[in-house]
């Protein structure tokens, strides 16, 4: 599981400590559909979502809103914090350039992760070192100070990418809102 521990002294001290964007992007790549991604993201057993923005001591449901402009997709991860207010948590950007090369990245909301918190895929066969000190994965985490570099990675083989660019793709519009959630979702304690 990828959940974070509140007791960890290396946390950023921001609400984003409770949702590791590296784990979210990894889950997104492995998902077959947007609905599958949304469901997996919100299941307690995956251990990824531990956000409690409405401060009710229960993990909030993260809804995935799809926006498309030609060959570019934006998947907005949102939490309904009240009946009248939603909070964007992060956005996943998937785009195809004129040479048909597909890129993917996730950008954390500045209020939750700080300014310019961007996770991009890294071309490597081993897990990338995470810059999020709240990350609790199976491997030991090292925080390394290094100049930021941008690496474009071809991600055509990811199941979710094959799905959104297939002729069978239909945009997903989740019907959920504050107080109304899917039957598989059970708000668990943080």
Predicted regions mapped to residue ranges:
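N-terminal low-complexity segments enriched in Gly/Pro/Tyr/Ser
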Residues: 4-190
């Amino acid at each position: 599981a990828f959940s974070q521990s509140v007791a960890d002294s290396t946390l950023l001290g921001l609400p984003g400590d409770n949702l590791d964007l590296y784990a979210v992007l990894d889950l997104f790549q492995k998902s077959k559909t947007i609905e599958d991604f949304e469901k997996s993201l919100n299941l307690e057993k995956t251990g990824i979502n531990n956000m409690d923005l409405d401060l009710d001591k229960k993990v909030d449901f993260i809804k995935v809103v799809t926006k498309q402009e030609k060959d570019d997709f934006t998947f907005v991860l949102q939490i309904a914090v009240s009946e009248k207010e939603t909070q964007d948590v992060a956005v996943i950007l998937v785009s195809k350039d004129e040479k048909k090369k597909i890129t993917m990245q996730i950008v954390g909301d500045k209020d939750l992760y700080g300014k310019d918190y961007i996770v991009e895929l890294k071309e490597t066969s081993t897990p990338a070192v995470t810059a999020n000190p709240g990350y609790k994965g199976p491997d030991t985490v090292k925080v390394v100070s290094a100049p930021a570099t941008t690496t474009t990675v071809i991600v055509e083989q990811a199941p979710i990418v094959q799905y959104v660019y297939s002729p069978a793709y239909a945009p997903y519009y989740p019907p959920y809102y504050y107080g109304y959630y899917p039957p598989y979702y059970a708000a668990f304690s943080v």
